Amino acid sequence: MLSKKQLRLDMKAVANALKKRYFYFDVDHLIELESNRKKNQIETQNLQNLRNMQSKAIGKAKASGEDIKSLLKNVSDLSTKLNLAKSNLQLIQSEIDVIVLSMPNIPHHSVPNGKSEEDNIEVSKWGKLVNYDFDVKDHVDLGAMYGLDFETAVKISGARFSVMTGKIARLHRALTQFMLDRHSEVNGYTEAYVPYLVNTESLIGTGQLPKFEADLFKTYLHGEKGETKTLYLIPTGEVPVTNMMRDMIIKENDLPLKFVTHTPSFRSEAGSYGRYTRGLIRQHQFEKVELVQVVKAQDSYQALEVLTTHAEDILQALELPYRKISLCAGDLGFSATKTYDLEVWLPGQNVYCEISSCSCFEDFQARRLQLRYKNKETNKLELLHTLNGSGLAVGRTLVAVLENHQQADRSIKIPFVLQSYMGGLEVMN
């Protein structure tokens, strides 16, 4: 979340910065709430001081044998007023917290202006688009020949799920193993295995709650004594990995921290009506290899550039043409200050499709998580900066491999870097 101190000092400047991403809030109402909070806080402190003074007076009166009935009544009256003042202060603070938690992050100055994905800027392209001399199929038609089965998934779970068997299941696994090995052995990430169910605090920490609850799958665990515990299926591996460091003070010598994890991701995609949903592109359950970095404030934007190249490295190794997009302010994710999307070319559909989103959050998540380090020079605790990116979305990478490496006879050429994971197989027939 945004700094409350920053809001108090220059609320109008924050409001103007958020207008860049077409987010508006009632500045006057928040100023009024903040004014009331200050008044109630002062009143609470004054009442607390008065009660303490009266309590000390009771002690002195007792010691000298004086009547303390009037003093006891004063303390009782002050306690009643103090409890009321504390209650009012808590209500005001809760209302402020709700507003602040609903505020997105402020875009970095380098982020292009714009309202929607149509205003995003292409930064670069890699790879040549093949001019096929045969009728190109999309991954749904190709996948059906190799064990990709949507009908069985509908029988088991409903729409937007998939079943894979045989060679295509092995190719999906090979992609995952290759990504994990590349990131851990070449790019310097520590592999992490994490829970797929997380609590409310974890999702608040990384910014999915309270704003995006409709996109999450929620579970209820009923205890023997009738109590109910709520857990959510993770929408991305970023959530449990980043929360590993919640409420921690990291040693400066241990920075930067770099983690890679492979998890399923679960999303209701409540807002996807009318968007492309054919095949594996937009599923309720899909797998990703996720990259997370925790760095000092001064290092975060250089880290974003490097993290993005780690995702690009996978695409290049798999010989998949792609483009790098800088998201405009209006298209940024809620917690991000700057984001690069990598979009892979899908010849079977004649479109570029997002396959990785790499973002810097500055201290937005760290403030919620209380993720800090002790600065050796100042000897003060400072918030860290967090970043994450997909390295890559496994299902969409499978789609890209099928469509880009298809041959005229409908066989699939296996990229060289995957062949050792496929038992030496060079072509999938």
Swiss-Prot record:
Q: What does this protein do?
A: Catalyzes the attachment of serine to tRNA(Ser). Is also able to aminoacylate tRNA(Sec) with serine, to form the misacylated tRNA L-seryl-tRNA(Sec), which will be further converted into selenocysteinyl-tRNA(Sec).
Can you name this protein? Serine--tRNA ligase
Keywords, A to Z? Aminoacyl-tRNA synthetase, ATP-binding, Cytoplasm, Ligase, Nucleotide-binding, Protein biosynthesis
What Gene Ontology molecular function terms does this protein carry?
Answer: ATP binding; serine-tRNA ligase activity
Q: Report the locations given in the UniProt record.
A: Cytoplasm
Q: What sections of the sequence does the record tag as coiled-coil?
A: none
Native species: Vesicomyosocius okutanii subsp. Calyptogena okutanii (strain HA)
Entry comment, domain topic: Consists of two distinct domains, a catalytic core and a N-terminal extension that is involved in tRNA binding.
Oligomeric state and interaction partners are given as:
Homodimer. The tRNA molecule binds across the dimer.
**Gene Ontology terms: biological process:** selenocysteine biosynthetic process; seryl-tRNA aminoacylation
Matching Pfam families: Seryl_tRNA_N, tRNA-synt_2b
- Please give an example of a GO cellular component term from this record: cytoplasm
Q: What class of enzyme is it?
A: ligase
Q: What HAMAP family is this protein classified in?
A: Ser_tRNA_synth_type1 (MF_00176)
Q: In which pathway does it act?
A: Aminoacyl-tRNA biosynthesis; selenocysteinyl-tRNA(Sec) biosynthesis; L-seryl-tRNA(Sec) from L-serine and tRNA(Sec): step 1/1
- Detail which positions bind ATP: 267-269, 354-357
CDD domains the UniProt entry points to: SerRS_core
EC number(s) per entry: 6.1.1.11
Residues engaged in binding L-serine: 236-238, 290, 390
